[in-house]
Amino acid sequence: MAIIITKQTPVIVQGISGRIGQFHAADMIRYGTNVVGGVTPGKGGSQVLDRPVFNTVREAVEATGAEASLVFVPPPFAADAIMEAADAGIRTAVCVTDGIPSQDMMKVKRFLRRYPEDRKMRLVGPNCAGVISPGQGFLGIMPPHIYMAGRVGIVGRSGTLGYEAASQMKALGIGVSTSVGIGGDPINGSSFKDILALFEADPDTDAVMMIGEIGGPQEAEAAAWVRDHMTKPVVAYIAGLSAPKGRKMGHAGAIISAFGESAQEKVEILSAAGITVAPNPSSMGETMARVLSLRAAA
C-alpha cells in the first residue's frame, strides 16, 4: 500500500502538450505511472505520447476515469486549472507550478473548502516536487531512480532536500513507502499535518522523515499533532539555521517574520514534542537509521 498514488491510479496531465509537461509525462510513463491522457484547451482530439488530449478536465475524466492530475500550467492560469480539476471530480491534484500569486491560492483554498469531505479534492503543492510511491508511480518532477521501495515516508517543503534524504537512506538500505513534497509557498494545499495523518494510517509506513524550513507555523503545528496523535517515530530536519530574519531564502514561504519561525525555534519545538531532529542535512539518513535501530531493539 502507498498513500496518494499507486500503480493503478489513473492520471492525467494538465498542460501535457507543453514542452515541460510532455517531458515529465514521458518520464512518468517510463516509470510505470498509469498516465491515461492529458488536457490542453484547444488541443482536444490530438494525441501526445500516444495518450489522448482533451479540451477540458471534465471531458478527460468522463473518457478515462482519471482520479489524479499533475498540473503543468503557467502561474497566471494555474489557479483556474486547479479549480477546474476539483470541479470535474479529480480526487488528487499535484501542482508543480511556481510563482502562483498568493491571492489566487487564497481563492483556490476557499473554492476547495465548499466541497463536502467525501468529494473534496486533495491538493499537493503548488511549487512542489510532487509525490512518488517507489515501484508504483509518481506525479511530479523528481528523479525516480534515487528512490528505493521501503517503509519510511518522506514529507517536506523542499523538493531537493527530499531527494537528498531518499538518496541517503537508499545508501543505508532504507527504502521509502511514499515521498510527498508539499511545496515551499506560504499558501499551499496540503500541510505537514495532513500528510503525517496519512502516514500514521498507512500500514506500510513504519516511520516518517519530515523536512521543514524557516518561515510559517506548519512545523510547530505538525509537532503538536505528532505529540498528541502519532504512534510512529518521526525524524525531522529544519533548513535555514543561519538564515537572517526578514530575508526570503529561496522559497516564497521561507522567511522569518514572527516568533517561532526561525530554524532554531522550530528545532526546539520539534524536540520538545519528542521528534528526533537531524543536526545537518548530511546526517538525515544516519539519524533515521539510528531511530529505526533503536525501535527494533525496543
State each model region's role.
Residues 1-298:
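Catalytic-core regions of core metabolic enzymes
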